[in-house]
């Protein structure tokens, strides 16, 4: 892997949702939780002052939803409420940070949730990564069987289905190019 401008710490912004999804899927594997298991997200967990297509679809109520759909909302649509739900599910943002670092990915740091970043936008700089660290995690996912084949394929599809950033990363690429991202 060749890295350019890798000495800087770049705020991950919503890219950290990828790391959260990897951590959540790994916890699901460890606890034998199927993707289609239903859970209940309480209305009070659906914060109003943040980007949340799920909350907009089901306003002023809790919702029964599968882990599969929570991860899709988080990765493919960039929903902040489902992101924070996954952070709570894995045991906190520090669990995401320590799990990714346990894989040998060191040049990154996660200390903030979507909720905390919305209270103070400057906190987004506390969640950072080098470009190489993200590339290393992607490579490990492809080469080291970190996730089961089912979970890897699911996450890959969620990334390919990502609706955000169409005017940035993939703008101008031929339409037959497959480009997965978060």
What are these regions (language model features)?
Residues 1-6:
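A short, well-structured edge-of-sheet supersecondary motif
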Residues 11-39, 74:
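Active-site SXXK
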Residues 15-19, 125-160:
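Active-site-proximal alpha-helical segments within enzyme catalytic domains
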Residues 26-46, 93, 148-153:
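Short, well-structured active-site flanking segments
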Residues 70-75, 86, 99-100, 138, ...:
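Short alpha-helical scaffolding segments that buttress acidic/His motifs in well-ordered protein cores
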Residues 84-143:
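Mid-domain, small-residue-enriched loop/turn segments at the edges of structured enzyme/sensor domains
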Residues 167-182:
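Short, Gly/Ser/Thr-enriched beta-strand-loop segments that form substrate-interacting elements
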């Amino acid at each position: 892997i060749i890295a350019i401008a890798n000495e800087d710490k770049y705020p991950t912004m919503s890219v950290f949702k990828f790391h959260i999804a990897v951590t959540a899927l790994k916890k699901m594997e460890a606890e034998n939780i199927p993707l289609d298991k239903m859970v209940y997200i309480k209305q009070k967990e659906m914060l109003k002052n943040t980007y949340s297509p799920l909350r907009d679809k089901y306003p002023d109520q809790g919702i029964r939803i599968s882990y599969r759909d929570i991860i899709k909302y988080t990765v493919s649509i960039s929903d902040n409420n489902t992101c924070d739900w996954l952070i709570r599910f894995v045991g906190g943002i520090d669990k995401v940070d320590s799990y990714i670092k346990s894989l040998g990915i060191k040049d990154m740091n996660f200390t903030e949730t979507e909720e905390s970043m919305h209270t103070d936008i400057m906190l987004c700089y506390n969640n950072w990564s080098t470009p190489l660290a993200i590339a290393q995690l992607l490579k490990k996912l492809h080469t080291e069987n970190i996730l089961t084949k089912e979970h890897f394929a699911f996450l890959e599809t969620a990334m390919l289905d990502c609706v955000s950033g169409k005017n940035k990363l993939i703008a101008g690429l031929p339409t037959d190019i497959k480009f997965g991202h978060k």
